[in-house]
Amino acid sequence: MSWHEVDMAADPRGGQFAYFRQMVDPFAGVTAAVDITDFLAALDGRPFFLSLLYAVTRAANRVPQLRRRILDGRVVEYDWCSPSYTLMKPDGVYVYSLIEGERTYGDFIAEGQRQQVLSLDRRTLTEDGDPLGNFFVSCLPWLD
């Protein structure tokens, strides 16, 4: 995955970065309850989770700051971040699945279905590719 270094001395948020990088865990996660009534109505038989994952991935990638990571003490911005997400196998064990690269909706769904089948053969949580260049996504519909 390609990325470029961000000049934090010239970045408007450089001071905030300098402050937060001193913290033990200077990273953020986002959890939100979202009304997806209209989204569900528009699915028309298409796979729910992969369709939602496609929409969330595209939306997150539109925000450059969400593609930024700390690599060897430097801030880098990935050109595109791929979704890595959890799947529960029939035996109750969780594994990761990854859909790499920017894709059209149809290709994303097809690759997601292929990766889910491949992921079912895994025995543990292992990460593929460059984990820094991923968005880590979990869907927990039973919490609300």
Predicted segments with their positions:
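N-terminal beta-alpha "docking/capping" segments at the starts of catalytic domains
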Residues: 1-47
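A general structural signal for short secondary-structure junctions and capping/turn motifs
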Residues: 22, 75-77, 126-129
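Broad gene-expression machinery/nucleic-acid interaction feature
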Residues: 29-31, 80-84, 132-134
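Short active-site-adjacent helix-start/loop capping segments
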Residues: 40, 60-61, 69, 78
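Acyl activation and transfer enzymes in specialized metabolism, enriched
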Residues: 41-64
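A short, aromatic/hydrophobic, helix- or strand-capping loop or linear motif
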Residues: 65-72, 121-127
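Small-residue-rich loop/turn and linker elements
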Residues: 66-98
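Helical lid/core segments from catalytic subdomains that handle acyl or acyl-like groups
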Residues: 89-143
